[in-house]
UniProtKB/Swiss-Prot annotation:
Positions of the UniProt region annotated as Disordered: 605-625
Organism lineage string: Bacteria, Pseudomonadati, Pseudomonadota, Gammaproteobacteria, Pseudomonadales
Biological function: Acts as a chaperone.
Gene3D superfamilies: 1.20.1270.10, 3.30.420.40, Actin, Chain A, domain 4, Substrate Binding Domain Of DNAk, Chain A, domain 1
Low complexity: compositionally biased ranges: 605-615
Residues spanning the signal sequence: none
Protein name: Chaperone protein DnaK
Keywords of this entry: ATP-binding, Chaperone, Nucleotide-binding, Phosphoprotein, Stress response
Pfam family, one: HSP70
Keyword hit for Nucleotide-binding: yes
Length: 638
């Protein structure tokens, strides 16, 4: 088994880590940062940008820059939360043929797992660059309150990215792993309060020493998969829009460029107000009318921000209360409170959490990195590198089937430790009924229609019998990823039917395979592009150094040599403008060949007269410190 990386696939930012020599290493990306924005952009020339490069161009390309796509994963287009998001994002959310929420970019419909796969590919590449070897296996985290469809969709994203997802692990559980691995032995109970970019989770976790093993047992979990930092940003954006309208009489709502600038400004202001009591948002030329350009200048205080979002923070308290009740734990028995997710840096969040739990949250856990670190530890456990850790997670929501009268009958209650298997015997509702439909549901409501439908299947060819006589045994089996397998068996005939719940939404196997193939094609294109860029850079460097050498050599170069080198230079410069790597490499070879005699002459002369060579060498060293940069003209589209 190879190295198993841990990936925190976040709504706003993502992070990757690995266990090395007993320590967890959070891996820096190519830009030198430990977290990567979960943003994907599709450029006009077909290039796919991920992370910081996508974020940088968002203002000029709002319709094709996708962010917070995790909020759509495993969701139906008609869900109220999706409809609310449609009003708030500049990109297009559309209805897929199966009713799922997809996005549309440049006229092409794309599934959220397909887009999330681009972020996972970036995380995979980050790990591969650091380790110097191919990575094919990962543990990926999801919000604890993700339902079965959302977990399946996350696993699909991993497959599309070329990863074998060894385990889906809940984010708060991962954070507890990161926190508890190096703590003193002994039993203690912790609360993990995880308020991220798009989701909120709270888990009650007991960390115990059992026969020399660290045992992490999740006692209860609760949350809201549509509450996070993005919602805080939206409140600020709305405030800025209202203030601007009061002053100018103009609404910015219909202007995607202005809204994208506002989004970035809101995020920046929110972060600044965690450490300052006041900040100013200054966006010149935000829009224009007949009287000329308009500028947005708004001062906002921390107290104003808190008044805008206080109800959002309050919404996190009820799930905390429910989780404690479900765990059967008194609030006074909590030893530590761990804050996870960037939004927990907000002073108001910390204040309310401290007030509710009656104790200060720990400050020694990095809220942006703890989840990825825990995922890496779980990866090491699965790989056999860590042997003294046992993780007992739970199913976050009740699972059951629809029975007569539209009632949901539970088979596996919420907060049941997984993996688990439960069976129950049901019967027919009518005389001589020859088939039953097993309708699998997830949720806490008694009325079947009020819960999330995970899928349906039929058990047919039941022998004729009066109602209530046939015995149909339904078995629910949840694996360690929290993914459900359901079976139904006629006990009289032994006939059985079983499925892995793929949900009545989600991607088909054919769709996933096609996306995997597309990703492989893109990967090959990316590799070719990198190789071409490398060849161009090598060619550019050789052109520069050769021209400098000719200038330094002066009259020591014969006319014949100069002509040959000039011809090779022109040929290489022309090749660099083209797209053929082999041609560039051939022209590099040619130029190297014709310029080699001149280089040898210069070297021999320097060897004879080292003092004369010292000055140019110093100048060359200075010049070599200069980093080349490429600039692209930004055209105003008016």
């Amino acid at each position: 088994m190879g190295r198993i990386i841990g990936i925190d696939l976040g709504t706003t930012n993502s992070c990757v880590s690995i266990l090395e020599n007993g320590n967890v290493k959070v891996i820096d990306n190519a830009e030198g940062t430990r977290t990567t924005p979960s943003i994907i952009a599709y450029a006009n020339d077909g290039e796919i940008l991920v992370g910081q490069s996508a974020k940088r161009q968002a203002v000029t390309n709002p319709h094709n820059t996708l962010y917070a796509v995790k909020r759509l994963i495993g969701r139906k287009f008609d869900e109220q939360v999706v409809q609310k998001d449609i009003q708030m994002v500049p990109y297009k959310i559309v209805k897929a043929d199966n009713g799922d929420a997809w996005v549309e970019v440049n006229g092409q419909k794309m599934a959220p797992p397909q887009i999330s796969a681009e972020i996972l590919k970036k995380m995979k590449k980050t790990a591969e660059d650091y380790l110097g070897e191919a990575v094919t296996e990962a543990v990926i985290t999801v919000p604890a309150y993700f339902n079965d469809s959302q977990r399946q969709a996350t696993k699909d994203a991993g497959r599309i990215a070329g990863l074998d997802v060894k385990r889906i692990i809940n984010e708060p559980t991962a954070a507890a792993l990161a926190y508890g691995m190096d703590k003193a032995k002994g039993d203690h109970t912790v609360i993990v309060y995880d308020l991220g970019g798009g989701t909120f989770d709270v888990s009650v976790i007991e960390i115990a020493e059992v026969d020399g093993e660290h045992q992490f047992e999740v006692l209860a979990t609760n949350g809201d998969t549509f509450l996070g930092g993005e919602d805080f940003d939206i409140r600020l954006i709305d405030y800025f829009v209202d203030e601007f309208k009061k002053e100018s009489g103009m609404s910015l709502k219909g202007d995607p460029l202005a809204m994208q600038r506002l989004k970035e400004a809101a995020e920046k202001a929110k972060i600044e107000l965690s450490s300052s009591t006041q900040t100013e948002v200054n966006l010149p030329y935000i829009t224009a009318d007949a009287t000329g350009p308009k500028h947005l200048v708004v001062k906002i205080s921390r107290s104003k921000l808190e008044s805008l979002v206080e109800d959002l923070v309050q919404r996190t308290i009820e799930p905390c209360r429910i989780a404690l009740k479900d765990a059967g734990i008194d609030i006074g028995k909590i030893n530590d409170v761990i804050l996870v997710g960037g939004q927990t840096r907000m002073p108001l969040v910390q204040k309310l959490v401290t007030e509710f739990f009656g104790k200060e949250a720990r400050k020694d856990v990095n809220p942006d990195e703890a989840v990825a670190m825990g995922a890496a530890i779980q990866g090491a456990v699965l790989a056999g590198d860590v042997k003294d850790v046992l993780l007992l997670d739970v199913s976050p929501l009740t699972l059951g089937i629809e029975t007569m009268g539209g009632v949901m009958t539970a088979l596996i209650e919420k907060n049941t430790t997984i993996p688990t298997k439960k069976s129950q015997v049901f019967s027919t509702a009518d005389d001589n009924q020859n088939a039953v439909t097993i309708h699998v549901l997830q949720g806490e409501r008694k009325q079947a229609g009020q819960n999330k439908s995970l899928g349906k299947f039929d058990l047919a060819e039941i022998p004729p019998a009066p109602r209530g006589v046939p015995q149909i045994e339904v078995t629910f089996d949840i694996d360690a990823n929290g993914i459900l397998h359901v079976g139904a068996k006629d006990k009289a005939t032994g006939k059985q039917q079983s499925i892995v719940i793929k949900a009545n939404s989600g991607l088909s196997e054919e769709e996933i395979q096609q996306m995997v193939r597309d990703a492989e094609v893109n990967s090959e294109e990316d590799r070719k592009f990198e190789e071409l860029a490398s060849a161009r850079n090598q060619g550019d460097a050789l052109v520069h150094s050769t021209r400098k050498m000719i200038a330094d050599a002066g009259d020591k170069v014969t006319a014949e040599e100069k002509t040959a080198v000039e011809a090779a230079l022109v040929a290489l410069e022309a090749a660099i403008k083209g797209d053929d790597k082999a041609v560039i490499e051939a022209k590099v070879e040619e130029l190297s060949k014709v310029s080699a005699p001149i280089a040898q002459k210069m070297y021999a002369e320097q060897a004879e007269n080292p003092e004369a060579a010292a000055k140019p060498a110093e100048e060359t060293a200075k010049a070599d410190d200069v980093v080349d940069a490429e600039f692209e003209e930004v055209k105003d589209h008016k």
